[in-house]
Amino acid sequence: MTPQLSSSVASKLVTLKLKPVVVFGPSGVGKSTLLKRLLKDHGDKLGFSVSHTTRTPRAGEKDGIDYHFVTKEEFQKLVAEEKFVEWAVFSGNMYGTSIMAIQELEAVNKKAILDIDLQGVLQVKASPIDAQYVFLAPPSIEQLEVRLRGRGTENESAILQRLERARAEIEYSEKPGNFDALIVNDDVEKAYKQLEAICLSD
């Protein structure tokens, strides 16, 4: 079951002056690489909405930069206090975007960039929040599998679960009206230029 965004939470974000950009797509498609470059090049105008998660940090990940790493109890407390715009559970781990993360960016005149999964996208779409939705797609499901296996960060079961989830996300992206822009990441430079143009547009 997909958690629902409460009206009290949504009302706090309806008045955003800068339209957030929601970037979604299968795990391993290259979102992190493109977004890190985007924020490095345009950190004065754009800001990454750092999500909360209960999962264990991967090698090289830093708390407060890649994610806010919290315990399950801490995460559940934030859910109960309606601190999240959206939240979801995947592979036993919880992920969420806090209201404060977006508000802090708005306060310094930066457009919020959200990297969330399909569950989160559906929650934000069901709210009054006016956002722009960008789907980042792999050249093929086969190439996505190669990328996932090449990372070497997960076991076979986790990889198969991510591939199953990727198929559902791609199926969702193929339906008219479910996104504002589709970018196929078959050429990193080309994909970056497309994403850059979208995020910098008014």
Curated annotation (Swiss-Prot):
Pfam families: Guanylate_kin. This is Guanylate kinase. It catalyses: GMP + ATP = GDP + ADP. It comes from the Eukaryota. The keyword 4Fe-4S does not apply. One of its GO terms (molecular function) is ATP binding. One of its GO terms (cellular component) is cytosol. GO terms for biological process: GTP biosynthetic process; purine nucleotide metabolic process. Its EC number is 2.7.4.8. CDD domains: GMPK.
